[in-house]
Amino acid sequence: TRAAVWKTIDQLRQEGYGIDAAPKRGYTLASVPDRLDTALVRAHLSGHPWQTLVTAVPSVDSTNNACKRLAAEGAPDGTAILTGCQTAGRGRRGRTFVSPPGGLYFSVILRPHAKPEALMHLTAMAAVAAARAVFAVSGVYPDIKWTNDLVLGGKKLCGILTEIGIEAESREVDYAVVGIGINCARVDLPPEVSAMSASLEAFTGQKPDRARLAAALVRSLCELEQALFTGKDAWLREFAAHCITIGQDVKLVRGDDVTYAHADGIDEEAALLVTYPDGTKAAVASGEVSVRGMYGYA
């Protein structure tokens, strides 16, 4: 009945859907709410093998922590958790990862059959996957700061944290969790954070559809897994082409020790190739050091 249709339309409007009414023509969907809803994300993944493995939650301590708990319980390859609110987001070496409201915080479980040393390039490939997803939704392909940040306008848009669990007997990888946090909305942040932070809304002038962005991440990360061992060279070439660290003079930070070098490129495992002032060359693994530009964050 008309009354039942109107009641449904009214309910959808209350939930944030933009619905236009036209006399004698009915209703049209003008916009969907900017919220991270499991059904909305899955709707963008029709027919995808990971569609039913993706779950959005209102809030979580850390999406990486959530996926690690699920992985320990036997959750399958492709299981993903996403949210707009992390209460205890983590970065590399246990640092706090600032998770402003309006962002997208996403982690996925991968089950590669490999030794840990065979996954040294995983974070670099994850950076490419995240950049491709951002491009698919916004039309902007971010720069990459070696090895785990995406950058817009010299400021951090996205951070990536990869963690692995090891089987005790075989010493092979039981699971890998890839965590990606993207600043989507323009929000007020403390000055010391704001000076280094970018958002898609601030850069493009439009808020991204986070459900679409989450679905794009799922697709990109599934493609990553398929290319992890047999197609990595093309992914690493893409990484190098967009890596703003390459060609820069950089600071290499190992705890309290700071050294200076010139970043020449990356090798086949995504280690940073550097030349020190005395002419010595080396390959620096991402787990060993943090890299800072000489003249700012990037």
Tell me what each language-model feature is.
Residues 77, 83-85, 93-103, 107-298:
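Catalytic beta-strand/loop module used to bind and position nucleotide/cofactor moieties
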